Amino acid sequence: VILGSAGMRIVTAGDMVCFAGISGGLNVSIKNDYNITVLRGQSVSEILLSPEKIGYTGIESPTVVLALSDEGVARRQKIFAALSPDTYVLKEASVAIPGTPAQVEELDFKAMKIKKTDWALASLAVLAKHEIVLNKDMLVFALKSRFNEKLFNLSMETVDKLI
């Protein structure tokens, strides 16, 4: 689950996770939640990756939560208390999250001089570094599949800062 705000490229990051999953031979499902008002409000992507056929697309207990904005967290705040201790939460330092039994890693993307519009991509790079859900090869495949050469190279600059 990716929790962000409008303009943070959350839907694009969700697409990247799907492309990465497909490259790994997985079945994928994505649901996006965002306001129709341009550049306002929450942006949330719920992604399922499974080696099995996906019948039910609801997420009851996510494996990973990327908490990148207060607006996104507010939209899905109830999930935090129900997360398992095995769930990995990556939280941007400026974002407050409710109490959770999950494993929480905090990163300060602003201090790393990563633009807010690249926080979602940076989070995927962290997942790839830790080999949680995806690895670097899967992420690179996804970026190459989705972007032209110029955008791919710009994206890789962000990825390389974190891997």
Regions found by a protein language model. Name each.
Residues V1-I163:
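Active-site cofactor/cluster-binding pocket
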